[in-house]
A protein has these predicted regions:
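General structural feature for long, well-ordered alpha-helical segments within catalytic domains
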Residues: 19, 27, 74, 78, ...
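Conserved protein kinase catalytic core
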Residues: 13, 52, 62-64, 132-135
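Divalent metal-dependent hydrolysis catalytic cores, especially in the metallo-beta-lactamase
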Residues: 60, 76-105, 120-133, 160-163
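Histidine-rich, glycine-flanked metal-binding segment
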Residues: 1-51
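Metal-coordinating catalytic core of metallo-dependent amide/deamination hydrolases
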Residues: 105-163
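Short clusters of hydrophobic/aromatic residues that line enzyme substrate/ligand-binding pockets
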Residues: 31, 65-67, 145
Length: 163
């Protein structure tokens, strides 16, 4: 599908400029010089600003959903919310937790990944702990911190399939 977005204020070359642009199959294929293009749809942006999508690399949850306890539907709810706010991609940051709860979060992420979904792209898992120095633990519960453990790390990596 080919869509022309016209009358947009596009962030391009480090500034906003009036530009029309083409989308083909959901991706920008051309910026400027779009007059005369045959399109399936034409959208007048009315001078609104268009910027690249934002990427959130550290998210513990949103819209009442905590990634440590989320099921696949919870991940989908977060994805849709982020997309509505201009975030196009994100990493779920699993807090330091028990092995069982961390494995649950990894399983639910994998379950979500194996379904059809919409909204922002959940790029993978960011394990925030449990291998942290107590002096730099921040808000992580100290009783759940662990000394480095390669077997546990391998178990998490295997469960996540490298995600």
């Amino acid at each position: 599908m080919k869509t022309l977005i016209k009358n947009a204020s596009v962030y391009h070359n480090h500034r906003f400029e009036a530009l029309d642009f083409l989308l083909e199959d959901g991706r920008i294929s051309q910026m400027g010089g779009c007059e005369g293009e045959r399109c399936d749809e034409v959208i007048d942006a009315g001078g609104k600003r268009v910027v690249p999508g934002f990427v959130d690399i550290h998210t513990h949850g949103a819209v009442g959903v905590d990634v440590n306890g989320a099921d696949a539907d919870g991940f989908e709810k977060i994805c849709r919310f982020f997309a509505s706010q201009g975030t196009t991609s994100w990493l779920c940051s699993v807090l330091t937790d028990t092995k069982e709860q961390t494995m649950y979060a990894i399983r639910m992420y994998k379950e979500w990944k194996n379904t059809e979904h919409r909204g922002a792209n959940l790029m993978g898992i960011h394990l925030e702990g449990p291998f942290l120095c107590p002096a730099y633990k921040g808000a992580m519960p100290e009783h759940l911190l662990k000394k480095p453990d390669m077997e546990l790390l391998k178990a998490y990596q295997e469960a996540a399939g490298g995600e």
